Amino acid sequence: MKITGQEVTIVMIEDDEGHARLIEKNIRRAGVNNEIKAFADGTSALDYLLGADGSGLVSAHRQLLVLLDLNLPDMTGIDVLSKIKGNTHLKRSPVVVLTTTDDSREIQHCYDLGANVYITKPVNYDSFANAIRQLGLFFSVMQVPEAN
């Protein structure tokens, strides 16, 4: 995935190592070779996205796509999503929510906050693998908007 010649960095925020490996494997299988920055908690991901000063200026010229689990060990994915979409420098970055939560109110809340896609991770491994393969296909046709 490129934007005007600039590579898009995929930021994966997923605390389950097995899920993270499966997601990356299927993204690669779909032919997407972009850099993947993996984080197992919201704090380290936000440090990367917002920078030490928390302003987000560090991401002003980055082309990012965020894969976000809602169930993180240190904060909720909703908190992470709110900070991303509430930041001037990050708000146009696409966010794909990938989580086991299928509560319709929580799904709507994610969309209300600015999530671009919400994918429910099945608990069953084969179903989960299939959902991630579909995510890989999604990546193969997706374009990321340019940063301002």
Residue ranges and their predicted role:
Residues 1-11, 17-37, 41-46, 50, ...:
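Non-catalytic signal-transmission and effector/linker regions of two-component phosphorelay proteins
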Residues 73, 103:
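The feature encodes the CheY-like receiver
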Residues 121:
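A Lys-centered signature of the CheY-like receiver
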Residues 68-69, 99:
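Active-site residues of response regulator receiver
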Residues 116:
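Short, glycine/charged-rich "phosphate-handling" switch motifs in NTP-dependent
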Residues 56-61, 85-92, 113:
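Conserved phosphotransfer cores of two-component systems
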Residues 92-102:
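A short, hydrophobic beta-strand element within the central beta-sheet of small alpha/beta folds
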